[in-house]
A protein has these predicted regions:
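Bacterial lipoprotein signal-peptidase II cleavage site
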Residues: 33-47
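Extended ligand-binding regions for polar small-molecule ligands
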Residues: 37, 94-98, 102-103, 172-175, ...
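Extracytoplasmic small-molecule ligand-binding "clamshell" domains
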Residues: 47-134, 294
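A ligand-binding cleft/hinge motif common to bilobed small-molecule-binding domains
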Residues: 134-151, 202-203, 230-265
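Periplasmic-binding protein-like
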Residues: 162-170, 241, 249-285, 307-320
Length: 320
C-alpha cells in the first residue's frame, strides 16, 4: 500500500489512542503536540513511499485501495513462470511483476491456472490481468477463438513486453531429420494446449501432402509434453523459444533434448487486460516503460539469459 493511505489516519485518532489515561487538559495538549508530530511523520513517510511508487496514481482506485493486482498465470512454464524447489513462484514474469509493482505501489499476486482458461478468468473478473508468456494476436485482441474462428468475447488489450518465436526440439541425438515444420508430416508432435505452437502445428498439418498429417498430442502444460517426448511417446515437441531453450539446457542435465531448425513466428508476449479497463492498461504500460528506462527490465531479462527477446519500449496491441 502506498503512504497516502497511511495519511488518511487522522492526527486526532492517533493522539487519542496515545493519551487516553491523562486528564482533560493534558489530553488537549497531547492532541496538539502528538497530532502535529504524527502529521509530520506521515508526510515524511508519504514522500518516501510515493517516490518509491511514483505511478500509483495511475491505477484504478479499487486496485490501488486493495494493494494487489491479481494475475492469472500458468505457473508451469520455465523460465517464464514456474515453481522452484521450495514452492515459490519464480521466473521472468514474476520478476517483472515485482518490478512493475514497485512502480505502482501494489503487489502482483500470481494465481495458477491452465493456459487455455486464463482469458476466461479475465472475462469473469477472477483476474485483473493475465501474464503467462501469452502471445499477442489479433484474434485474442478481438475475442475470436483461434480454432473455430468464432467470436467468444469482447477480446483483450495487450501491453507487449517481450518477443519470442516458436521452436522445435527433439530427443538429443535422435532428431529424425527434423529441421522444419514440413519435416513433421507423418510424425507426432507434443505441445501445450491453446498455445501458438498448438495453432501452428494444426496449420502446418493441413499443408502436409499424401495423407501424412502431423499427429498432434496436446497437454495442459509443457512439462507434461516434455515427459511424453522424453519417454519416447512422440517424435518432437514445440514451444516458445525461451521455454524450449530452457528445457534443452536443464532437462536431464542437458542430456534429454536438443533444438532443431530455426525459430519461426516471432511475435510479442503481452500482458492481457480487459478492454473494459483502459486505466489499468495505461498504468501497466507506464510502469513497463519506467522499468525499461531505469534499467531494471534489462537486469531481469539478462538474469534469465533471454536478452534476444528484450524490447526497447512498451507497446499496446502490437501483435498481428
Amino acid at each position: 500500500m502506498t503512504a497516502r493511505f497511511i495519511c488518511r489516519t487522522t492526527a486526532g485518532k492517533s493522539a487519542k489512542s496515545r493519551t487516553a489515561t491523562v486528564g482533560a487538559i493534558a489530553v488537549a495538549g497531547a492532541l496538539l503536540l502528538s497530532g502535529c508530530g504524527d502529521q509530520t511523520k506521515s508526510k515524511d513517510e508519504g514522500g518516501e513511499k510515493v517516490s518509491n511508487a511514483p505511478l500509483a496514481d495511475k491505477l484504478p482506485k479499487d486496485i490501488r485501495d486493495a494493494g494487489v493486482i491479481k494475475v492469472g498465470s500458468d505457473i508451469a512454464y520455465p523460465p517464464v513462470e514456474f515453481k522452484d524447489k521450495s514452492g515459490k513462484t519464480v521466473g521472468i514474469d514474476p520478476d517483472l511483476g515485482d518490478a512493475l509493482g514497485k512502480q505502482l505501489g501494489v503487489e502482483f499476486q500470481f494465481d495458477n491456472g491452465t493456459f487455455d482458461t486464463l482469458l476466461g478468468g479475465l472475462r469473469s473478473k477472477r483476474y485483473d490481468l493475465a501474464m503467462s508468456a501469452m502471445t499477442d494476436t489479433k484474434n485474442r485482441q478481438e475475442g475470436v477463438d483461434e480454432e473455430t474462428g468464432k467470436k467468444i468475447g469482447t477480446g483483450v488489450d495487450f501491453v507487449d513486453y517481450f518477443t519470442a518465436g516458436v521452436s522445435i526440439y527433439t530427443k538429443k541425438g535422435d532428431d529424425q531429420g527434423i529441421k522444419t515444420w514440413s519435416d513433421l508430416c507423418g510424425k507426432k508432435i507434443v505441445v501445450q494446449r491453446g498455445t501458438v505452437s498448438h495453432d501452428l502445428a494444426k496449420a502446418e498439418s493441413k499443408k502436409c501432402k499424401g495423407g501424412k498429417k502431423i499427429a498432434i498430442e496436446s497437454f495442459d502444460n509443457d512439462q507434461q509434453a516434455q515427459t511424453r517426448l522424453r519417454s519416447g511417446g512422440a517424435d518432437a515437441g514445440s514451444s516458445d523459444f525461451p521455454v524450449a531453450a530452457y528445457a534443452v539446457k536443464t532437462s536431464g542435465g542437458g542430456k534429454d533434448f536438443e533444438l532443431v531448425g530455426e525459430q519461426v513466428e516471432a511475435a510479442p508476449y503481452g500482458i492481457a487486460i480487459s478492454k473494459k479497463n483502459p486505466e489499468l492498461r495505461d498504468a501497466i504500460k507506464a510502469a513497463l516503460d519506467a522499468i525499461i528506462k531505469n534499467g531494471e527490465y534489462d537486469k531481469i531479462i539478462s538474469k534469465w539469459g533471454v536478452e534476444d527477446g528484450s524490447v526497447k519500449a512498451a507497446k499496446v496491441n502490437g501483435g498481428k
